[in-house]
């Protein structure tokens, strides 16, 4: 049986997505605090899937070699995620390889988690690259966080301590808001006033 067919048809699976530094974490934290709803995070699952001795870890080590191991900050020989990000940012072929490895693994794991929550009427799936990784088919609806590029840029520079040029390049690696909005059901406006998206969530969740 196709693993997708195991998902309950009457379960509401909300795919929450948006550009980098658009405010997904802020909205996720609000839902976690005010709603008794399970939240699955694709980034967290991705981190779990590249821990030492996992399939993903071994494949990455085979591809990049020992240079990708963080030998200074841990004794477990975990992958240096900052170095990995820098590599795939600069080398498109490495990014494509990582995407082809991790996206299917994360999707499979997320489906398994959804099945575990089969008795929950509603769950939220936080998937930053929902469209890029083609996760649409596991969601029953898609919520997109709206944030102006300038605000994204400022948040990204502050959060990741990178240059303005690097911030723009990182933002441009993802699909634009305009493109994503064509395939989204709900827009959560996180431009300035949080009450905008808070009121929207109160109405529909």
Curated annotation (Swiss-Prot):
Positions that bind ATP: 21-26
GO molecular function: ATP binding; dephospho-CoA kinase activity
Catalytic activity field: 3'-dephospho-CoA + ATP = ADP + CoA + H(+)
Metabolic or biological pathway: Cofactor biosynthesis; coenzyme A biosynthesis; CoA from (R)-pantothenate: step 5/5
EC number of this enzyme: 2.7.1.24
Main location: cytoplasm
Biological process according to GO: coenzyme A biosynthetic process
Chain ranges of the DPCK domain: 13-205
Domain of life, per lineage: Bacteria
Entry's localization field: Cytoplasm
UniProt keywords, alphabetically: ATP-binding, Coenzyme A biosynthesis, Cytoplasm, Kinase, Nucleotide-binding, Transferase
Gene Ontology cellular-component annotations: cytoplasm
InterPro entries given in the database record: Depp_CoAkinase, P-loop_NTPase
Annotated function: Catalyzes the phosphorylation of the 3'-hydroxyl group of dephosphocoenzyme A to form coenzyme A.
Similarity field: Belongs to the CoaE family.
Record's protein name: Dephospho-CoA kinase
Organism of origin: Prochlorococcus marinus (strain MIT 9312)
């Amino acid at each position: 049986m196709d693993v997708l067919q195991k998902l309950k048809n009457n379960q509401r699976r909300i795919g929450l997505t948006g550009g980098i530094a658009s405010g997904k974490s802020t909205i996720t934290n609000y839902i976690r605090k005010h709603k008794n709803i399970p939240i699955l995070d694709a980034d967290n699952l991705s981190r779990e899937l590249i821990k030492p001795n996992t399939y993903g870890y071994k494949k990455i080590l085979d591809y990049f070699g020992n240079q990708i191991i963080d030998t200074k900050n841990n004794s477990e020989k975990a992958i240096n995620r900052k170095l990995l990000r820098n590599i795939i940012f600069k080398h498109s072929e490495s990014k494509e390889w990582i995407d082809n490895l991790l996206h299917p693994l994360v999707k499979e794991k997320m489906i398994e988690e959804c099945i575990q929550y089969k008795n929950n009427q509603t769950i939220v799936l936080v998937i930053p690259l929902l469209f890029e990784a083609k996760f649409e088919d596991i969601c029953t609806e898609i919520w997109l966080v709206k944030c102006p590029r300038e605000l994204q840029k400022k948040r990204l520079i502050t959060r990741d301590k990178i240059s303005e040029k690097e911030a723009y390049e990182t933002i441009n690696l993802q699909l634009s808001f305009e493109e994503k909005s064509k395939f989204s059901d709900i827009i959560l406006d996180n431009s300035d006033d949080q009450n905008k998206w808070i009121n929207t969530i109160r109405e529909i969740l």
